[in-house]
Amino acid sequence: MSEVGKRNPACPIDRIGLKTTGMVRYNFGAAALYEEAIRRGEARLTAHGALVAETGQHTGRSPKDKFVVRDAATEPEVWWDNNKAISPAQFETLFADFLAHAANKDLYVQDLVGGADAELKLPTRVITEFAWHSLFIRNLLIRPDKAELGQFVPEMTIIDLPSFRADPARHGSRTETVIAVDLTRQIVLIGGTSYAGEMKKSVFTMLNYILPQKGVMPMHCSANEGPAGDAAVFFGLSGTGKTTLSADPSRTLIGDDEHGWGPHGIFNFEGGCYAKTIKLSAEAEPEIFATTQRFGTVLENVVLDADGVPDFNDGRLTENTRCAYPLDFIPNASKTGRASHPKNIIMLTADAFGVMPPIARLTPAQAMYHFLSGYTAKVAGTEKGVTEPEATFSTCFGAPFMPRHPSEYGNLLRELIASHGADCWLVNTGWTGGAYGTGKRMPIKATRALLTAALDGSLKTGEFRTDANFGFEVPVAVPGVDSAILDPRSTWADKPAYDRQAARLVGMFAVNFEKFEPHVDATVMGAAPRMQEAAE
């Protein structure tokens, strides 16, 4: 086995049984990986120096093809209602077949770290078949320095082989695509997909399993910090404004997607960003756009014109076009990836029913309720002429990546909020003056003004009213914001229609929360929206 690159000589890849007749390249940097990816025909150079690759059939994650090993250790710990199981024997067969498949391949190895807190970090070795995947994960995770590489011992190992094809009869998979996670041995096998995001989310899944045992809250959120050291976290599902609202030139960006909240404060799990690029423009998001114009960034499924210039408006391959770049490509990004305990927790929703206020203050119990609910609303495809919004509930704002029961994460969050006195806010970036199709989108200027008032502490000193439907507190007046939008009912021309819509949404919350009722206490149940008042 031929091996090149900086590494710990006492820790080769054959320690997990992986041997190959090909070349193993350890910890190559961007320039060398560019050369490899282009030489092998995996990727192309853009006119501005970024690397662009296509993922073929899989242009997003394959959640239905993800499996967790059900063994004696994970049996009582994993939320099996939400995680598909494979047996240890099936995993062993799959693992052996992965090793056999890799036995004649050139491989790329990156020794990286998940978690910017030195006491809680997860040293992770990522072994890939593609050079561009190696650069992708090098951009996304935290890179040790040369001295640390010489001593590096991985705790987690990912083997990523897009050319592998799983056999459902032999491996217990659903299709030829498989993401198999052994939480006990901390091994992840990814086969039959070239979508690079699977690697990133595998590390997130592992940290989501490990950290709660240490009293640390893993969070699917963005985070930033003000000049006075006041940190804020932003929970939110796709399309709610998580990336946009946390990108604030007056605040330091800690990270855009995955964080932990531990004894020393919050910390980024990653060292990079994986941003959506569909319809990306220099005017709307200048910092993200600038990263796509430089050497080192990986573009995924982005179409190039004849001159090699990315066309971010072209979604012919997928609407889920992406760019992956190191965090230090963003001018106001944190150099440490760490911040103090958050002073403010923001839960974002895009309520297309037009019922929720633009901002509301939550008690710790209400925060747990809304965290477990993970509500937003999707707008139906206008091409079908359907204008009815569709409620979406993704518990913990990230159900696909949570191996444990949601109540574990919810209780942890509630305890941390209470012990550190964080203020919690629900921010609605959805519709006002009516539902989708009748009302209009909440003005971003108003959302930013409300957010600024929440983060600088001025909002909580003002006057609040209690919302009749949801029971949370809503500000009555905020400087620079039209007071009318603070009371959603007043913005509707048809008040009885608002009441019916509110009752309907409250009912959806209640039905969704039924599965959590056995796992929460009376205080959290008391924080639920009030069906009777809403229906009156």
UniProtKB/Swiss-Prot annotation:
The note on cofactor binding and number reads: Binds 1 Mn(2+) ion per subunit.
Which Gene3D superfamilies has this protein been placed in?
3.90.228.20, Phosphoenolpyruvate Carboxykinase, domain 1, Phosphoenolpyruvate Carboxykinase, domain 2
The gene for this chain is pckA
Q: What is this protein called?
A: Phosphoenolpyruvate carboxykinase (ATP)
Q: Where does ATP bind?
A: K201, H220, G236, L237, S238, G239, T240, G241, K242, T243, T244, E285, R322, T447
Family annotation (SUPFAM superfamilies): PEP carboxykinase N-terminal domain, PEP carboxykinase-like
Per its UniProt record, what PROSITE patterns does this chain match? PEPCK_ATP
Where is it mostly found? cytoplasm
Where does this protein have coiled-coil stretches? none
